[in-house]
């Protein structure tokens, strides 16, 4: 059985104690380890965990998360910080960003400072925006060397210049972004403005399967968010056909359209994403 897609329906299936093999297309808050159940989701948390691994692999020590206020930001911060800790990393800092309108108005201000509050000690009710006085430089003994941004294409079009305005374009901080900022709409000016930024993308949209990419984008009228779901459907079929291996063979890996797929002991499917970089007006592989 493939599905369901909604978290509450996944929880209902778990309560039913079905004997069928189930590939749930979402991950509930509390995962249960059952021999007939795997969880496969395209979620911001999933992407944040992959970002933590990628940034850690690049030798970064002190990441700053630039994320939206509200539930989405909370989910990203929690997932990234948990994974960073598992990797042996130290302090993760966060700064909350306002709406597109607030970012736009910030163009006439002082830009975005690369400072933040430690994730572990900041209550979720305390949000900061555009480098407010509540942000502290760093308490971990080192300076910020990476910033992970979760924003739409329009928002990141303001965020990156605002960072450069405040910190200088030659700052030593490497900027990373989630696929939320990549919707296939970037023209040459945008690509030049984003120079040096690395972002995660599913392999299909990074060029690993050009035929399926063309088929998917044609089917969804070039909507990248829907194309990612299209790729998820293709991967769900592959996972269902390799359910026993994913569930029972530690280290088993499928090269999927949404990532290189492996399973945790609870059979939560992890995705290793492709990372791309804007370089001299082009998009090239970052890893």
Which residue stretches match the model-derived regions?
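An alpha-beta-alpha
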Residues: 39-98
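Short beta-strand elements in bilobed, periplasmic/extracellular small-molecule ligand-binding domains
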Residues: 34-37, 85-122
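Segments of small-molecule ligand-sensing domains
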Residues: 180, 216-286
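Periplasmic-binding protein-like
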Residues: 1-5, 23-25, 64-68, 116-153, ...
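Extracellular/periplasmic periplasmic-binding protein-like sensory domains
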Residues: 37, 117-122, 142-146, 160-234
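Short beta-strand elements at the ligand-binding edges of bilobed clamshell
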Residues: 31-54, 191-203
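Beta-alpha junction/loop-to-helix N-cap segments that form part of ligand/metal-binding clefts
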Residues: 1-31
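Second-shell loop/turn segments in exported
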Residues: 36-42, 62-70, 94-97, 134-137, ...
